[in-house]
A protein has these predicted regions:
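Short hydrophobic/aromatic beta-strand or adjacent loop that forms the aromatic wall/cage
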Residues: 57, 66-68
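Conserved catalytic core of Hanks-type protein kinase domains
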Residues: 41-42, 63, 83
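Basic, Lys/Arg-enriched alpha-helical interface segments
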Residues: 2-57, 74-77, 93
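Enriched for short, Lys/Arg-rich terminal
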Residues: 68, 72-94
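Conserved strand-loop elements at the edges of beta-sheets that form or border functional pockets
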Residues: 7, 62-64
Length: 94
């Protein structure tokens, strides 16, 4: 399956990495690469994440970091919807 990142999901990931980079550019790069690698696993295991809070979605919990990546499995692709820190309030809309 193909992974498609929505623009707002990429923006979320970049914003989070930029925030981490203020303290440690090396940690920011490690975080960014870890999220990308985690999401790549969905190509082979699209239902790896838990059932999502929003109907029709799933949530990939990022190991070693307090982040969740909500996504949607389509017929031939996986849509990455957002990247959220676990401590933040969940938005009404993805």
């Amino acid at each position: 399956m193909q992974v498609k990142w929505l623009a707002r999901a990429l923006a979320n990931l970049t914003e989070e990495a930029d925030y981490i980079a203020k303290e440690s550019p090396a940690n920011a790069k490690a975080f960014f690469m870890h999220v990308l690698a985690s999401v790549e696993q969905l190509k082979e295991h699209p239902h790896l994440g838990r059932a999502g809070r929003v109907t029709g979605t799933r949530e990939l919990v990022i190991t070693h970091y307090p982040y969740i990546v909500p996504y949607r499995v389509r017929n031939s692709s996986i849509e990455i919807l957002r990247v959220f820190h676990k401590a933040r309030a969940w938005p009404k809309h993805l």
